[in-house]
Amino acid sequence: MITQEKSSAALPLHRTMKCLLQVVAKRLLSWHLSDYQNDEGIIKESSSQIYSWRLKVDTKIKKWLKAGMNIYGHYRETSTPRVNEYDGLIQQAMYFPSTIEPQDEDGNYNNSFFEGSSTYNPMGHIWEADNANKTINNRIQGYVQFDIMDGLSFRSQLGVLLDNRLNTSVQNDKSYYAFKNSNLSQGQARSYWNTSWLNTNTLSYVKEFNANHRVNATAVFEQSYDNNFNHTGTAYGLDYIDRIGINNLAWSNAELATNSSDRVINTLMSGMLRV
């Protein structure tokens, strides 16, 4: 089954496409879902695209054995002008006179009010915007359940997360950053990598003697691992910024470049017994 939605009567523009495939067999239940969504914001250069997917399989192997797997994730790409509380696009647009042209005859921004006080032209936030935020996220979940005897069962499940993000931005010599920093251009790339998993093992026993008497016992053992790595590289005074952009930050003023990185690892092991 494929469905498609499109709304273009008024901005923002929103497009959605979905595809669903379901298979049912004697001992197998499987379904697949994919989705695409594209949003174009009211402000130019503002957009969001996301592709998502899911594959789910459940099966009964034996009378006493069940298993299943769930794989899902998404890829997302967004971009937006500078919309901040301080000196952002919306704030600047509210106060900047509409009778002043965005640029003069030489293509330079008119960055001042009538009386001569300095302020960044709000159209520069849109026309000079050059940034992208990309995320790819994948999750895998699986389980195995053993029905050992009447009322007694054991279930082990494992979930894995793989998450990778890349945020890039280029501030050329006409950007807001250059306006505030003596015409100095900037390029920045930030990457995040996360790997984590969670394993949960549950042993449960339920026995009913009559309407008023029942035994319910549960034992749980759980362990998890989380590994996060972040890296940021920032360059200033970029060469051939309109041609190379973020693709080679080494073509810049090496004396001003900065790099930073960090890694955080978390582990956990816990248990619980309840009767």
Indicate residue ranges for each PLM-predicted region.
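Structured alpha-helical segments in the cores of large, soluble enzyme domains
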Residues: 17-23, 266-275
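Surface-exposed loop/interface segments of Gram-negative outer-membrane beta-barrel transport/assembly proteins
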Residues: 1, 41-137, 155-270
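Outer-membrane beta-barrel architecture
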Residues: 20-22, 33, 56, 141-143, ...
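Intrinsic-disorder/low-complexity, polar/charged segments enriched in Ser/Thr/Lys/Arg/Asp/Glu/Gln
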Residues: 16, 137-139
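Active-site and adjacent substrate-binding regions of carbohydrate-active enzymes
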Residues: 151
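Residues embedded in well-ordered regular secondary structure
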Residues: 1-45, 81-85, 108, 124-132, ...
